[in-house]
């Protein structure tokens, strides 16, 4: 382990990101989000009023000083590719800065797509090697969080690690969805199990397990060696969590990096924020939290901005209808281009160009771009997909049986509405 002085850390915080390339795994389908990902990859799903989920990983790279980024795509990639081309063309090729889009190469005989997360990198190794990076940062493109990757890189170098895995404690009942690890006093990973049926508890806290966040740092040459060997292993599933990390744990080459050490927070006393938003309820809840008085995730931090594709839209407008009813909102996010006419919106998130007509009551709802709500509608505890037309007088979120018959209703009572579901009800989806 190398002991670094303060000045050394400042220098490395600038130097290490320049010697690194980030690879964002963005090919996931996100099946637990149900129909919300039928036509888009999970990283391309809208979030927070104006963003896409992948904007968080991309912004973390930019804010951390990593200006060489590869985005590995696969499932329903058109929307994602279009978003990155329109919103992330700010890098300078002359300065060797870029966002490369890396689609599935289909190089394996008999294989149409990537066999696993590790194979997604393996199939692009000829391109990745050209970046001539010293370190490779592997990221998931479908998580919501703010992290300074330069701090993680410093920790990687200071520990003399060949591989670093970012981790955080999670409730033991949720740990079955993660890779779970045990570490020694130096943070060396001494055991790693991917998605165990009975997750081991952390020492001293039987209610939690130490979970991998799917964020890794590798010495580049070491990663290339690992992937070459894994590619030849017919017994491997070619996945980082299932194969690569357990292997290097057995070899004693993997170290853990506690997420709180590099999590970016405006309030140092707050709990580190990281969300998978992999289920409809988690997605709905994370969006609505941003509209609360004191949200867990600070989106107003000018020192760590989240960037996205910015459309030229007029400001949101709240108008009085002919009967004298005023458009009003409370504890809500309302994006540009929205018009609220004589209706009440409470604890909700409205994405760009949403139109709500008179006499409506919108409560705890997430309305994606271009949703049009007819007069006298009541929407509660729901997610309305992009460009849906909700007909006059429709009620959603008040009758469980009716909601389950017409739309998708989760076990927690969150209702998802899409254009296809409305068409099946003979509701015209063109205006």
Swiss-Prot record:
UniProt-listed Enzyme Commission number(s): 2.7.7.27
Any single Pfam family the record assigns to this protein: NTP_transferase
Gene3D superfamilies from the UniProt entry: Hexapeptide repeat proteins, Spore Coat Polysaccharide Biosynthesis Protein SpsA, Chain A
Designated gene of the protein: glgC
Organism (species): Salmonella dublin (strain CT_02021853)
Binding sites annotated in the UniProt record for alpha-D-glucose 1-phosphate: 114, 179, 194-195, 212
InterPro entries in alphabetical order: ADP-Glc_PPase (IPR011831), ADP_Glu_pyroP_CS (IPR005836), GlgC_bac (IPR023049), GlmU/GlgC-like_hexapep (IPR056818), NTP_transferase_dom (IPR005835), Nucleotide-diphossugar_trans (IPR029044), Trimer_LpxA-like_sf (IPR011004)
Class in the EC hierarchy, top level: transferase
Protein name, UniProt field: Glucose-1-phosphate adenylyltransferase
Ligand binding (AMP): 40, 46, 52, 130, 370, 386
């Amino acid at each position: 382990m190398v002991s670094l002085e303060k000045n050394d850390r400042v220098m490395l915080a600038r130097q290490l990101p320049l010697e690194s390339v980030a690879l964002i795994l963005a090919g996931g389908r996100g099946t637990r989000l149900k129909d919300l990902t039928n036509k888009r990859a999970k990283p391309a799903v809208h979030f927070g009023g104006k963003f896409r989920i992948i904007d968080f990983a991309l912004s973390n790279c930019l804010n951390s000083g990593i200006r060489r980024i590869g985005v590995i795509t696969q499932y329903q990639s058109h929307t994602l590719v279009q978003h990155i081309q329109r919103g992330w063309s700010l890098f300078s090729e002359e300065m060797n800065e870029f966002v490369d889009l890396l689609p599935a190469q289909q190089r394996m005989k008999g294989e149409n797509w990537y066999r696993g997360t590790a194979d997604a990198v393996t199939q692009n190794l000829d391109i990745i090697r050209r970046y001539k990076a010293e370190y490779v940062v592997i990221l998931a493109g479908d998580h919501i969080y703010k992290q300074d990757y330069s701090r993680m890189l410093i920790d990687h170098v200071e520990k003399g690690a060949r591989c670093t895995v970012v981790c955080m404690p999670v409730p033991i009942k949720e740990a079955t969805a993660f890779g779970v690890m045990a570490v020694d006093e130096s943070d060396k990973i001494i055991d790693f199990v991917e998605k165990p049926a009975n997750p081991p508890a952390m020492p001293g806290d039987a209610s939690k397990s130490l979970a991998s966040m799917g964020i890794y740092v590798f010495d580049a040459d070491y990663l290339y060696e690992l992937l070459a060997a894994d590619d030849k292993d017919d017994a491997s599933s070619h996945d980082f969590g299932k194969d690569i990390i357990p292997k290097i744990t057995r070899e004693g080459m993997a170290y853990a990096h506690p997420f709180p050490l590099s999590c970016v927070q405006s309030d140092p006393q707050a709990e580190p924020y990281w969300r998978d938003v992999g289920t409809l309820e988690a997605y709905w809840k994370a969006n609505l939290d941003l509209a609360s008085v004191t949200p867990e995730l600070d989106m107003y931090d000018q020192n760590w901005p989240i960037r996205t594709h910015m459309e030229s839209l007029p400001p949101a407008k709240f108008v009085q209808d002919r009967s004298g009813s005023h458009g009003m909102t409370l504890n809500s996010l309302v994006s540009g281009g929205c018009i609220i006419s004589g209706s009440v919106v409470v604890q909700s998130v409205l994405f760009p160009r949403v139109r709500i007509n008179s006499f409506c009551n919108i409560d705890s709802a997430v309305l994606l771009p271009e949703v049009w709500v007819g007069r006298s509608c009541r929407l509660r505890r729901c997610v309305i997909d992009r460009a849906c037309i909700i007909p006059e007088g429709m009620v959603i979120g008040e009758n469980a049986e009716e909601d389950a018959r017409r739309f998708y209703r989760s076990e927690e009572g969150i209702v998802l509405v899409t254009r296809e579901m409305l068409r099946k009800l003979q509701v015209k989806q063109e205006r």
